[in-house]
Amino acid sequence: MKDQIKNTTYLVYDCACGSGGMLTEAEIFLLELATGMGKKVVIHLFGQEVNPETYAICQADMLIKVKETDNIKYASTLANDGFPDFTFDFMLANPPYGKSWKVDQDKILVGRKKEVKDNRFLVKHQGEELQLIPRSSDGQLLFLVNKLSKMKDSTKLGSRIAIVHNGSALFTGDAGSGESNIRRWIIENDWLECIVGLPLNMFYNTGIATYIWIISNKKSVERRGKVQLIDGREWYGKLRKSLGSKSCELRGEDIDRRTEEFLDFSESDNSRIFDNEDFGFHKIVVERPLHFSFQVTAARVQEFGEKMGDDLLGVVDILRGLFGEEVQWDFNLVKRDFEKALKVEGWNLKKRDLDLIYQIFTEKDERGEAVILKQTKKGVVYQADAELRDTENVPLKENIEEYFEREVLPHVSDAWIDFDKVVRGYEISFTKYFYKFQKLRSLEDIVEELLELEKETEGILREIVFE
C-alpha cells in the first residue's frame, strides 16, 4: 500500500470514534509512512460519536491539536449519518458489539413489514435486493456496512477499511439473514482481504475473542478472489497489572509478526489462503412426502358431527358406503373415489369443508402411500410433510444434485429438494481452520496417575471417619 501513497490529500474516517484516539494514531501512522516514502500529504480526520462525554473529549482533543472540529459529529451513526455524501480513503473503527440497536430502528426500518428506508442498508446485488439488516440485539455489522457505503472508487488506492469485530460477526446468522447477506455482499464483491485473530482480553470492557477485518475495494492482483486468515491469537505480551478485562497487549514484535504474515501472503501454520467461494454455501430445503391412512370410526364420525353439523351427515353415509370401516392405506384413491361420488350424489362442498373432512378421517402413518399434491408434465409432485422437513448446507464448490445423491438419498430415498427455497449464505469458521489436534493421553498413563492418587490419599478416609 505504501508504494501507492501520493502527494495528495487523504480523508480518514471513524464512525464510532469515541475520544478520537484511533483517528489520531491513524494520522500519525500515515504521516510517518508518507514521510518515509518522500511524500507530502494532507490528512483530514472525520468521526462520529453518540456518547456525549467521549464526544466532548474528542472535540477538546481536536481543538488542542488544531484540527477541524466540524468534522466530528455528535449523533448515532446508524440513525443519523453525519457524512452522507462523503467517501473516504481510509476508514477504521472498533464499534460496539453485542449491543442492541433497537433505539435506532425507526430511522432505518419503516412500517409493519419493517421495510428498509436507509439506502446504506439495502443494496442491489447480482439481480437480487439484499437487506443488510442484522438481528436487533447486535448492530456491530451495521457500522461496517456504513463504511462500505463510503468507499472511494475514483482513485488507484481506492478505500481501505480496518474494523474490529467479535467472533459472532464471522458466522452468526443463517443463509438469507442480514448477517449472512452482509458477508455475502462483501465476499462476492471481492472486498475482503484478510481477517486477523487477536488475543483474548485485549480490551478494557470484554475478554471475548476479537478479529480485525481488513477490507479493500482495490485489491492487489495476487489477492483477487482470495481471502487470507491470520491466527495471531497467541502473539501478545502480558500486562503486569490488568486494566479491567484487559490483561494483554500487542508488543512491537507481535505487530511485526502479523504484518509479515500479511505481506508474505502465503500458507503457514498461522496463515491460510482461501478462495472467496470456500466460505459460501447453498442452504437447501430437503422435503419428504406426507403419508396418510384413512378410516371411518365412531369417534371420528362424532367429531365430524360436532365440527360440520348434522346437515352434512349424509357425507358420512357416502364414506361408509365406499370404504366401510376398514383402514385405507392409499389416501390418493380415497380422495379420488370420494370426490367422484360427491358429484354423482349432487353434493357441492367448498374446499375448506373437504379439507376438514380429510383432516378428521385421516392420520399421519408411514405405512400409507405418499400423498400426491398434483400431476405435472415432469411427473408426480408429492405433498411435503412439514414435520420431516430438513435443511442441508452444500458448499458452493459442490454441485447440489451430486451432494444430495451422495449425502441425503442413501438415508432417505423418498426425499427431494425444493429448489424454490435454495438460499446462498456465507460464514467464516475461523477457529476450525486453525484447529490443532490434542493427542489424547494413553490409558496406561491415566491408570498410573489414578494409582498414584490412590496412594496419596491412603488413610485420609480413615482419619475423616474415625477422628
Regions found by a protein language model. Give the residues of each.
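Conserved S-adenosyl-L-methionine
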Residues: 1-93, 97-113, 166-168, 174-182, ...
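A conserved structural/catalytic subdomain of Rossmann-like adenosyl-cofactor enzymes
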Residues: 85, 89-462
